[in-house]
């Protein structure tokens, strides 16, 4: 029978519930269990697809095209599984589904209420995740903080699941904070006690408490927490700030967290073999070289907006024993006059995805700098579109060339809507989303990176390269090295007379893993290191 683990958070948000859930998932997977994981977000948006990155951070896209929470990126990178649309559920999705059922008459004229209709829908999403993946263990992270009004239906639903399927099949893990008061020179357990009290008042008794802390937690403090929160002392797990995220699973294993979980859920599996993971962490902690990459974006104040890009750069660096330092460059501040000052000290330039016109001209200036100065360049999504526009303007001499997204009246729409997108008015869920094939041309940087004729990558965009400009750009050394299998859609572009200048319409960062870097990132970082060494 499938087992269910629920991870909740208390005291404050951003405690690392997602990393805790992902780390536990890795440990259980390494015990030979089939693990899946999901995130429940209490906000009323149907998905984060139309939310500002300043509000939410990155939108992570799954193979099947779901626009999801950035925590799913952590889950995929840690557990090394590909998640699906069932892995991220929002209040908006739940209510939308219930209201559609009500309109279809599925409730037989009954009064539709939070209990049982909303809670039943939530429970069904939990069970469905296990069914669809045939999982031994389903880990579900409940977003938000215990005490938030938005989380109440989710907490009630997970309380009911224990009654439905029995205590041996359900486990509750509560993540809290033990703050350190500098003036008093001591740590305080009271916020954790109150958070657990709040959770218990809702009918949920946590089986494990994971305490986030800056300082070591003494045995006396663990005993105190165990007493007040009614759990075993060994089930108080310390989650101290780590020098690398990938060290967290090892820290949890040292404290026997996965064994406590298996004992409670009556899972008789051998201990997790973390030899490879330990070697990875040792490598990460002892990188001997450095390279600096300029990330030219418009959301640089909130680095979570580019979290998968940064992780993919790091993963690529690990292959070369290199610590990749990201220099954050606000695209709105980049001009032809200061671009040398802003990116001149870096070994490679990356322009990530984005929407809208803010910061576009600064990105184009940075791309021109990379092209003219032979600096390794990687463009992603909008970065690929702007690389095409920069080339059209400055090499073909097409003054005013642009994307019809940015300037609908441009005389040269290098980037334009697909014909089937022209009449679409809704913004949510109407992009080209998810995994699509890309056919590569031999003897190109893209082919050399992948070493395969056809690759599959995840997309999130609406606008495409306008094929009427292809012949003229090819004549000038612009290479279309990756296309859709029918050749209609441009997927990857690069430059002939440049050490390494590649840009992709898809989002390669989404499939990178710490032990298996994404090929374009791998070769981009390699080219950046070569550039540094040649200076």
Curated annotation (Swiss-Prot):
Subunit description: Homotetramer.
Active site (catalytic residues): 381, 507, 509
The UniProt record lists the keyword Nuclease: no
Residues annotated for ATP binding in this entry: 14-19, 71, 240-242
GO biological process: 'de novo' CTP biosynthetic process; pyrimidine nucleobase biosynthetic process
GO molecular function: ATP binding; CTP synthase activity; glutaminase activity; identical protein binding; metal ion binding
Domain annotation Glutamine amidotransferase type-1: ranges: 292-534
HAMAP family found in the cross-reference section: PyrG
Similarity-based family: Belongs to the CTP synthase family.
Pathway: Pyrimidine metabolism; CTP biosynthesis via de novo pathway; CTP from UDP: step 2/2
Reactions this protein catalyses: UTP + L-glutamine + ATP + H2O = CTP + L-glutamate + ADP + phosphate + 2 H(+); L-glutamine + H2O = L-glutamate + NH4(+); UTP + NH4(+) + ATP = CTP + ADP + phosphate + 2 H(+)
PANTHER family named among the record's database cross-references: CTP SYNTHASE (PTHR11550), CTP SYNTHASE-RELATED (PTHR11550:SF0)
Gene behind the chain: pyrG
EC number: 6.3.4.2
Identification of the protein by name: CTP synthase
Gene3D superfamilies: 3.40.50.880, P-loop containing nucleotide triphosphate hydrolases
InterPro entries: Class_I_gatase-like (IPR029062), CTP_synthase (IPR004468), CTP_synthase_N (IPR017456), GATASE (IPR017926), GATase1_CTP_Synthase (IPR033828), P-loop_NTPase (IPR027417)
Keywords: ATP-binding, Glutamine amidotransferase, Ligase, Magnesium, Metal-binding, Nucleotide-binding, Pyrimidine biosynthesis
Regulation: Allosterically activated by GTP, when glutamine is the substrate; GTP has no effect on the reaction when ammonia is the substrate. The allosteric effector GTP functions by stabilizing the protein conformation that binds the tetrahedral intermediate(s) formed during glutamine hydrolysis. Inhibited by the product CTP, via allosteric rather than competitive inhibition.
Leftover remarks: CTPSs have evolved a hybrid strategy for distinguishing between UTP and CTP. The overlapping regions of the product feedback inhibitory and substrate sites recognize a common feature in both compounds, the triphosphate moiety. To differentiate isosteric substrate and product pyrimidine rings, an additional pocket far from the expected kinase/ligase catalytic site, specifically recognizes the cytosine and ribose portions of the product inhibitor.
């Amino acid at each position: 029978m499938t087992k269910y683990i629920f991870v909740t958070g208390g005291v404050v948000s951003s405690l690392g519930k997602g990393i805790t859930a992902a780390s536990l998932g890795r440990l259980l997977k390494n015990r030979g269990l089939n693990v899946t994981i999901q995130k429940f977000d209490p906000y009323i948006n149907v998905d984060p697809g139309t939310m500002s990155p300043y509000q939410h951070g990155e939108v992570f896209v799954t193979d099947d095209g779901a626009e999801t929470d950035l925590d799913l990126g952590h889950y995929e990178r840690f557990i090394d599984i590909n998640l699906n649309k069932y892995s991220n559920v929002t209040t908006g999705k739940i209510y939308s589904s219930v209201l559609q059922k009500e309109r279809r008459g599925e409730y037989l004229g009954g009064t539709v209420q939070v209990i049982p209709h909303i809670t039943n829908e939530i429970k069904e999403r939990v069970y469905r995740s296990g069914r669809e993946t045939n999982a031994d263990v389903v880990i579900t992270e409940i977003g938000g903080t215990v005490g938030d009004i938005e989380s109440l239906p989710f907490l009630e639903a997970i309380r009911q699941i224990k009654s439905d399927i029995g205590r041996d099949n359900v486990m509750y893990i509560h993540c809290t904070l033990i703050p350190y008061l500098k003036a008093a020179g001591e740590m305080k357990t009271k916020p954790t006690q109150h958070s657990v009290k709040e959770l218990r008042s809702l009918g949920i008794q946590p089986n494990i408490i994971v305490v986030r802390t800056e300082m070591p937690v003494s045995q006396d403090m663990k005993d105190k927490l165990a007493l007040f929160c009614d759990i075993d002392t060994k089930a108080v797990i310390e989650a101290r700030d780590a020098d690398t995220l990938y060290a967290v699973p090892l820290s949890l294993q040292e404290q026997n967290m996965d064994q406590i979980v298996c004992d409670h859920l009556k899972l008789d599996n051998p201990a997790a073999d973390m030899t490879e993971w330990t070697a990875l962490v040792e490598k990460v902690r002892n990188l001997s070289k450095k390279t600096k990459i300029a990330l030219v974006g418009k959301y640089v104040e909130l680095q979570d907006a580019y979290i998968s890009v940064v992780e993919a750069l790091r993963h690529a660096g690990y292959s070369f024993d290199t610590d990749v330092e990201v220099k954050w460059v606000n695209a709105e501040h980049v001009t032809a006059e200061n671009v040398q000052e802003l990116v001149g000290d870096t070994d490679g330039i990356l322009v990530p995805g984005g929407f809208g016109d803010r910061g576009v001209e600064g990105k184009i200036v940075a791309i021109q700098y990379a092209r003219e100065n032979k600096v390794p360049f990687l463009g992603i999504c909008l970065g690929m579109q702007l690389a095409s526009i920069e080339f059209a303007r400055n090499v073909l001499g097409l003054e005013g060339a642009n994307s019809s997204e940015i300037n609908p009246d441009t005389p040269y729409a290098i980037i334009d809507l697909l014909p089937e997108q022209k009449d679409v008015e809704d913004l949510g869920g109407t992009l080209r989303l998810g995994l699509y094939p890309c056919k590569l041309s031999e003897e190109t940087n893209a082919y050399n990176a992948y070493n395969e004729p056809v690759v599959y990558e995840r997309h999130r965009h609406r606008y495409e390269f306008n094929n009427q400009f292809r012949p003229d750009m090819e004549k000038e050394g612009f290479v279309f090295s990756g296309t859709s299998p029918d050749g209609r859609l441009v997927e990857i572009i690069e430059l002939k007379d440049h050490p390494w200048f590649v840009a992709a319409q898809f989002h390669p960062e989404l499939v990178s893993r710490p032990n298996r870097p994404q090929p374009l990132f791998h070769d981009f970082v390699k080219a950046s290191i070569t550039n540094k060494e040649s200076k």
